[in-house]
Amino acid sequence: MQVYDISQELFGSVVFPGNPVPAHRALKRMEDGQAANLSEISLCTHNGTHVDAPRHFVSDGRTIDRMDLNRLVGPCSVIAFEGLLTASDAARLISGRQQRILWKGDMAFGVDAAREFVRAGVLLVGVESQTVGTDDCRADVHRTCAAPVNLGGLEGAPCRAVLIRP
């Protein structure tokens, strides 16, 4: 089994305009005579690699702590695509694939493509503007784990996303 980390490093990740920049500071340092190192972080729930809960765009949607983790862990397909994904592109590319789709490349999709994902029973759509996976990780079917931090009542949370080649 090989595990590939597909997460962005949080403090070096691109920040959406207007969102706070993630930061950290040392509270305790062993080099200063403390018994342990201890840090404090501040971040937006949508900085870096993260999971959006339905609450992010639906006022009464489920919060991150109420999401079914089974949707975020399991077999997935990695599909390379560049540009704007249309509904017909989505239907063609996801046909016969796993229910979890990770898109590799600089891509975006609109409402019609999102509706096609729902119609096809897609459980997870992963997008990263830089890449999903690494150059040596080109096999089409993997397993993925993108479990979010359990932040009760919030609309999103950071996660450590990985691809697993059995």
Regions found by a protein language model. Name each.
Residues M1-P166:
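Active-/binding-site microenvironments in catalytic and ligand-binding cores
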